Amino acid sequence: MADVPPTRGLARTALYAGLLAGALDIAAAILQNLEHPARVILQSVATGWLGASAYEGGWSTAWLGLISHFCIMLGIAAIYVSLAVIWPLLQRRWIVASVAWGAVVWAVMSFVVVPISASTVEPAGAMWPAVQGLITHILAVGLPMAWITRRMLGADR
């Protein structure tokens, strides 16, 4: 266990990875749904807490959605960083790992998280939105998380 970086370094890595991926992911969601105001996209995240009434809450529920989104991304980043410490191969083969991690995150979000919320986001079964979501999660979530983890923890392990 002498190889394990200090907890502070792991937390900082997860923080940076989560913030970057969170910003890229929510920006992509807003840009891919320009037919809806950004407020509505953020409120769709808050439906996990409030159900459909999140859409009636104005900017207060949009802020709740944004904060929730970043908390989710920080959790996802913490899991990835922990896995990368356990399996250093994730740092050495970070590009392959980023594709796999983005796909895993997309699958969990599409088939577990979104269905149990009251979000009006299209279901993952529709082909183009599913492909678009998968690509977005690979590029906006998997890639930055893997890159930051490799960069901050080192790939020589």
Q: Where do the PLM segments sit?
A:
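Aromatic-anchored segments of alpha-helical transmembrane domains
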Residues: 22-26, 102-112
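Hydrophobic alpha-helical transmembrane segments
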Residues: 64-84
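Membrane-interface interhelical connector segments
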Residues: 35-58
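Internal alpha-helical transmembrane segments of multi-pass membrane proteins
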Residues: 12, 85-108
